[in-house]
């Protein structure tokens, strides 16, 4: 039997569009909705079905497309499907994952376009140019209604008529949850759920809570993303939430990615790696993760996949197996006999897609690309500064048109000038301690009595979310992440600067933290260690982004408190 190959997309290099712009493009959105419906309807035992592709990440516990390892699955390996979480392969393994879904949807879109009786040539062109959209949560933490709240959407069908149809982006409906062998609570839910209002059989999406949680996380998400671009310079620190040697002062791409999973899922599917891809928002999320990888790589163009280990193993990688840029990225077949490897996946253009920030750039001029992308990162995610203007991408068509509007100068932007101190909380823990996803919530000021209010509290500085399979294990997996603090201080206090003599007393007096399980209950985390660090930084008028110096650890701020720094 031949394999389903992950192949470069046809139609030339086309940009993936941000979902807020994508839903305004009638042809692209109409084809996407119909193609997704067709993929959902594909029999579950077929490799190109949504059920099979989503199941690659974890459940059901079956091989995908005959991709098996060189040895039998080891009992010491904790089943995680094929995905390479906690590994230096995390960014590169997920690139063909989004691509295979995009490839299948593209095929459906082209077949659908051929059935249009009105303006067929335009629909066929739109289908050829179709690329999967991404959700830029670092700029727009709350997705558009077409993704999270509209049970029906209006599309143009092949007869040229506007028609209201069920919205496939809201949820995926299982033929039978028994087909996946899921554990509770997923074995009693017929559809995927986001921030469900209970764990019972009749649980429903809680859209209002989803919006509130995501909105309250916006400032922290934006800042964490910006810091990742500016401070993370090596592949081990960039690629994985597993602590790497040499120390880091900012979140990895995987750590930020974890935050989105738990914020969207709550106690629902997106919060559990074993079932997360069944929620269609997973691929909007991971398309953006892929975009951030492309942007970071354009800035750090001399850095790519470095050696590491497979952590707890996968269906084809043994426990702690050494991995590098030549490791097979199973189950993604490049040919009938070979898998894709990380060193073959560096260029998105070679795979048939790009992102709006790269449109019109000469990708062979790496220094020029570096400067342009650095500037765009500052415009998209950096605090607005005097004289700087924000980038607005107008992607109503398949080509990027850039316009500019005056930027509002935020209070954070006013304080980040010249020499300044950038404050963060370093969060360490054993991700497997409690057997489910959880959130370490950092507060300045009073903490609400009701744990359900923690993630929407105005006193929440930010949170570090652990994205964990809901099964207990004795394996210890230390994880590290960071919660930026400056943006909260700027917007909620009257401090004139981030100077040590001003900020340190504020943190020593008012800083508190709590642990919230995915099911909404509070917990104690014995492995938790919260340490405050200050990164001396400098922002000049001739550079778009600040330069950082070695961090200073203020261990005394949290030492002696439960979950605080263990060293004095």
From Swiss-Prot:
Residues the record lists as binding substrate: 261
Cofactor note: Binds 2 copper ions per subunit.
Residue positions binding Cu cation A: 57, 85, 94
Pro-piece positions: 383-565
Keywords: Copper, Melanin biosynthesis, Metal-binding, Monooxygenase, Oxidoreductase, Thioether bond
Biased composition (Basic and acidic residues): 553-568
Keyword match Oxidoreductase: yes
A matching Pfam family: Tyrosinase
Site annotation Cleavage: residues: 382-383
Oligomer and partners: Heterotetramer.
Protein name: Polyphenol oxidase 1
Gene: PPO1
